[in-house]
Amino acid sequence: DEGNTKMRIALISTTQVEQFDNPDTRGATDTLPGVFRCWDPSRLYEEVKTARENADFVIVCIHWGVESEMQKEYRQDILADGITKAGADLIVGGHPHVLQAIGAVNGKPVAYSLGNFYFTSYTTDTGLLQVQFSAKEKKMTGLRFVPCLQSGTAVQLLEGAEKERVLKEMRDLSGSCGVSLDEDGWASW
């Protein structure tokens, strides 16, 4: 809030991975809660368009990709293209359980996978996204990858050589997608 200037942010959460109902992740219906499946993305695109009409900024959080693969897959790019064309300003992905690139699709940032933030008892690199907004301008003014380590179901911010190691990994992954990360993790595309 900058001088009582407000910004409306829409958040849509969906899964492209789970195609079928199971007891843990039942699909949402008009009368029952559950997950929003987008194996057929047409409904997702409509929801993004509706959100775009009612919000200043639209974020789509999506469960997608291939587990344990650090490289994004072609289906993620196809879906990201449709989501951004429908009006999303930022896509944040998960499911691979490892870090994947931060890229740009149609000029909009896509964090393909931030790894595991709080999931298992093993040790793995992970990260946060810091999104900076200007409510006055009604837009995102910065995007930063913050390196973390998940160990024993606890997450810690990384510093020093470990922070630089994870930032280098993300720079290498993201560079092939046209995104650069500075020494503090701020992205540019």
Please give the residue ranges for each predicted region.
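Acidic, metal/ion-coordinating pockets
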Residues: D1-W189
